[in-house]
């Protein structure tokens, strides 16, 4: 995905405010051997790009003053109540250095999973993304979680997911965390419990 930016020479709160009033968003690109560079981007283009999943989890081609660099979106700051992007940070990436990125999960075959189709259960997304380590060329836009064989009251763990080549998951404390599950709706569980209690009641003499 290509992102066009321009060099920004003036800094400070007042300069940033004037920049935003002109329809631009201040930002910075840092990392690698080069010095950090102050940049500005068209706000509307950035606003629409931020709505795309790939913008957050893929290598971007950031063009500044006609020169392209590979970069990752690292952070962005929003206005508390206005639809306004206040600032954006990009990090340069090197083809030979591994990166740490959160990659979104795409849950496949949810409606046709046995636990949903036959067991009338609901799918619970315990995790929505995974933090991975890989070379930039191996970074996937998303990771698939296939629920095609998941039964009612079963849980899918990290070890059940087939990771793309060259990608490892960074876990924090739990080496095999739960990713998704299929369970009975809360109402169905309550009704079943009430039915069991009613069946166990003994009529008064």
UniProtKB/Swiss-Prot annotation:
GO cellular component terms listed in the entry, alphabetical order: cytosolic large ribosomal subunit
Region (Disordered) residue spans: 184-205
Biological process according to GO: translation
Classification via Gene3D superfamilies: Ribosomal protein L25, beta domain, Ribosomal Protein L25, Chain P
InterPro entries: Rbsml_bL25/Gln-tRNA_synth_N (IPR020056), Ribosomal_bL25/Gln-tRNA_synth (IPR011035), Ribosomal_bL25_b-dom (IPR020057), Ribosomal_bL25_C (IPR037121), Ribosomal_bL25_long (IPR001021), Ribosomal_bL25_short (IPR020055), Ribosomal_L25_dom (IPR029751), Ribosomal_uL5_bac-type (IPR020930)
UniProt keyword list: Ribonucleoprotein, Ribosomal protein, RNA-binding, rRNA-binding
Residue ranges the record marks as coiled coil: none
Family: Belongs to the bacterial ribosomal protein bL25 family. CTC subfamily.
NCBIfam families membership: bL25_bact_ctc, PRK05618.1-2, PRK05618.1-5, PRK05943.1
Protein name per UniProt: Large ribosomal subunit protein bL25
Organism: Cupriavidus necator (strain ATCC 17699 / DSM 428 / KCTC 22496 / NCIMB 10442 / H16 / Stanier 337)
Gene field: rplY
């Amino acid at each position: 995905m290509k992102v066009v930016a321009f060099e920004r020479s003036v800094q400070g709160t007042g300069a940033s405010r004037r920049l935003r009033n002109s329809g631009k968003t201040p930002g910075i690109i840092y990392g690698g051997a080069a010095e950090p560079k102050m940049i500005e981007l068209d706000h509307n283009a950035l606003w629409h790009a931020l709505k795309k999943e790939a913008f957050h989890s893929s290598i971007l081609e950031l063009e500044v003053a006609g020169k392209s660099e590979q970069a990752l979106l690292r952070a962005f700051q929003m206005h508390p109540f206005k639809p306004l992007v206040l600032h954006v940070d990009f990090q340069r990436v090197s083809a030979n250095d591994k990166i740490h990125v959160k990659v979104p999960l795409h849950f496949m075959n949810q409606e046709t999973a046995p636990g949903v189709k036959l067991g009338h259960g609901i799918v619970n997304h315990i995790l929505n993304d995974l933090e991975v380590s890989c070379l930039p060329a191996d970074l996937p836009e998303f990771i698939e979680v296939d629920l095609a064989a998941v039964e009612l009251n079963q849980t899918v763990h990290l070890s059940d997911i087939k990771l793309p080549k060259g990608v490892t998951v960074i876990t924090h404390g739990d080496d095999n965390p739960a990713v998704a599950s299929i369970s009975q709706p809360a109402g169905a569980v309550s009704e079943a419990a009430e039915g069991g209690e009613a069946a166990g009641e003994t009529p008064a003499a």
